Amino acid sequence: MITKRNIPCKKNWKYKKKSISLTLITICYMFLFLTSCKPGKQNSINLLLLLLNTLDNKNVNEKIEDSTNTDPSSNVNEEDENSINANANDNAPSDSDSSNPRSPDKNPVNPTSPNSSSADIGIKILSHSIFMAPTNLSSWGDLGQEERAQRIASSSYIKNQDIIVFEGLSHNNAEKILLEKIRSEYPYQTNVVGRTKKGWNATLGAYTTSPMANGGVIIVSKWPIEEKVQYIFNNSNCGQDQYYNKGFAYVKINKDGKKFHVIGTQLQAREPDCFNSGETIRKLQLNDIKSFIDSKDIPKDETVLITGDLNIIKGSNEYFDMISKLNVNEPRYVGVPFTLDTKTNALAAYYYEKEKPIYLDYILVSKLHAQPPVWQNLAYDPISNTTWKRSDGYTSYEFSDRYPVYGFIYADSSTPTKSGHKRKYDQVSFQSTFNRKFIQADHNKKDGWLKADTRIKTDFTKFNLLQENVSESNPSCMNSGSVRIESSYYLNYYWNWFIGAASGDYGYYTKFNNGSDSLGIKNLDNGCLKDGSRVAFYDWDTIGGGYYYLTVWDKGSWKEHLFLWVQSFLSSREIFYLHLDSNPPKDWSKDLIYHH
């Protein structure tokens, strides 16, 4: 009974002591705060800190002594989060005192965990299928391969990357031009997949020397490549792909001591000659990739990236099968909505005119290996600063039929935030001063008649202007002179005039890859073409000779059609207002994730 009476007495005294100590501490802190603004305060502050330290040590000792379940030896180096000393240290200035570093995170991320996110992991990778088939395959022929290689090499969109994977680079001269010109920035380079066994640490799969073309995949890097393996797919490709040594390149890259494993590939193309558009073959090729990754026994704390032209439509059943088969996470998609876009990319529209826009290119991260905190895929639509020409005169500013894709953790100042495909003189419209109606292409036929017959702007009233004799693809100022006028809705369909045995001679329509060579635009207000400029169009009559102006026909069944008719005098039927497109380029800056 005596013991029971003594225990509560002891506790009450203990709490009283604590209450007194806390009261003294509070008073000291208030005094410390009040003196902090006065001159000659340092001696007072030192005295108070000494008192606080004494009180704190006393409290800590009492805690240890009074605990019935504490092993004193286990608490010698343990920090008490609620101790006065800990709070005092946190409140004291630390940026100028290296002797008092902040305590480490009590729950650090395990960098070896497959699902961990390491703050210091960082890689920037670009994938681009650049459509450079060899000329010995007659179905492709001249694609401006060497001209485009020159422009890609000097472009800004390939700058500031750690790694680039090129696909579709099977043209030998174009390959030499491109790789040599970017060697100073990307000195570590693989050979192209499927051409030779030289330069590889290993060649696996069904390599053969008989195909007409190599596999077209090349990886270049800013950082040392420690291992290079080429793998040729173990299945028979179909359609055009049967002539290629298709497979993938594997590289192990050392970036400042960190290892990154990259697989770059171009899977079976989506061809109508193939059973189910080649899906069965692509599944087998994905199996080859997954089996190879498994066989490498890559450490779980190293990043594995699978990238390239996978020819699998985003959002399709095949896409989700791919995500599952490769055991990868879906990236965060930003940028333009398609990588093969027949509505915006003239080269894609030229060769795949009947295809709808689709997304086919990816940079994916293996789930079984190191995981970044976030992984973004940005599809971007750059154009060349200068135009290029094919041997037949076809002129373009596209780098490829595909748009490139960037893979990265966090966006930075070099990350594209807006569409690069918006030229100043794209999607312009022309309004007749005669009837106040806009010129438009036919709604039902790509090669239909041009008419000034609508008061409403639509996709059919928009046209792209290009002066083929000017090398600059996107001039800030376009003057009077020869011009190619292309329907913005029907890419590669240009203004031309008709001549034949039927009615409609000298009437204008849009014709595939065949614009009038002598068509010109005249700015009646002089200077640069700008919004609201009054313009007239002229062309050469190859039948009767001489230049004539285009006019809006004003009667009969051909009313409101455009004809090459007036030779000298300009009336309201020959004059049009030019309207520039005021819509801003697509902006995805708010969709990007930046590191804060």
Swiss-Prot record:
Ranges of biased composition (kind: Polar residues): 67-76
SUPFAM superfamilies: DNase I-like
Catalytic activity: a sphingomyelin + H2O = phosphocholine + an N-acylsphing-4-enine + H(+)
InterPro entries: Endo/exonu/phosph_ase_sf, Endo/exonuclease/phosphatase, Sph/SMPD2-like, Sphingomyelinase/PLipase_C
A GO cellular component annotation in the UniProt record: extracellular region
Region (Disordered) location: 63-118
Disulphide connectivity of cysteines: none
Subcellular location: Secreted
Top enzyme class: hydrolase
Composition skew (Low complexity), residue ranges: 83-118
Alphabetized GO MF terms: sphingomyelin phosphodiesterase activity
Stretch forming the signal peptide: 1-36
Alphabetically ordered keywords of this record: Hydrolase, Secreted, Signal
Pfam families: Exo_endo_phos
EC number: 3.1.4.12
Database matches in PANTHER family: SPHINGOMYELINASE C 1 (PTHR16320:SF23), SPHINGOMYELINASE FAMILY MEMBER (PTHR16320)
NCBIfam families reported for this sequence: sphingomy
The protein's name: Sphingomyelinase C 1
Encoding gene (name): sph1
